[in-house]
């Protein structure tokens, strides 16, 4: 039976804690997309480069970005989850990007109840290497060639 992720609320404690629906687990080299019509996750494609998702990737429930899709989110946690998993997470900041449709923000968040990240409240609390890794991944994962890549930048915390 298909799941109705569209009916899932943003979260009881938003904006401090929000519900994220995971499309792609950490470590995957496959890009999955949610098929709204059928209520399932489909393999969109393997990544073009020998990359993997550095953290779980999905969307924040109950949101809508300028491009008509829910807000994208990368969820930092100790372990990968799975396609379709709903994770309560705490937003930390945003990665400002552009794609063919225009602005394409990626929210960076952490698992709300992961004791390994309990002290992380803003992007400033993350190691610089983690931020660079996320930024690097986001620059490379959609484009097969360097000339197609868009610039991104990591601003201050949310």
What are these regions (language model features)?
Residues 60, 65-72, 76, 82-112:
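Domain-level detector of nuclease and nuclease-like folds
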Residues 27, 114, 139:
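Residue-level marker of positions within ordered structural domains that often coincide
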Residues 21, 133, 137-141:
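Residues that form generic nucleotide/phosphate-binding pockets
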Residues 141-148:
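Conserved small/polar residues in nucleotide/adenosyl-binding loops
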Residues 104-136:
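Well-ordered alpha/beta subsegment
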Residues 152-158:
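Hydrophobic alpha-helical segments, chiefly the membrane-spanning helices
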Residues 64, 148-151:
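Short hydrophobic/aromatic residue motifs in ordered secondary structure
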Residues 2-55, 69, 79-86:
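A cross-family signal for N-terminal binding/gating loops and helix N-caps
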